[in-house]
Amino acid sequence: MDHRDINTNMEALREVLRYKNKVAGHGFLFDDGDLVWREEDDATWRRLCDVVNALISSKRMQRVLYMDLSITKGEGHLLFVDLQGTKNRLHKEPRFRRHLILIEDFLAYPR
C-alpha cells in the first residue's frame, strides 16, 4: 500500500460517507431499505461508531465489511478502505480512499 494514499484526518472519513450518499447515490448504511444520512443529527456516523465499537470489543473479529467500506482492526489503529471500484466511470471517484485512524482518537472523537 502506498502511504501517500492514506489519510489520517477523521473529517476526511466523514467526507467519504457524505460522498457515498450525495455524489455516488448510495449511502453507507441502510435502515429498512432507506438511506440513512442526516446532516443535522449525523445518524450515519453514530451507526459507524456502533460498528467500530463492536469490532474493537471483539476478541476474534479483525475485519468488518459494511456496504462498500472495509474496516480492519490493527495494533492500536483502524484502517478504513473505500472499496468502490476505480474503473466505474459512472461515479466520480472519492477524494480519499484509505483512512488510518488510531483507535484512541476514534473513541475520543465527538459523536
UniProtKB/Swiss-Prot annotation:
<comment type="similarity">
    <text>Belongs to the novirhabdovirus NV protein family.</text>
</comment>
<protein>
    <recommendedName>
        <fullName>Non-virion protein</fullName>
    </recommendedName>
</protein>
<comment type="function">
    <text>Plays an essential role for the viral pathogenicity.</text>
</comment>
<dbReference type="InterPro" id="IPR003490">
    <property type="entry name" value="Rhabd_NV"/>
</dbReference>
<dbReference type="Pfam" id="PF02484">
    <property type="entry name" value="Rhabdo_NV"/>
</dbReference>
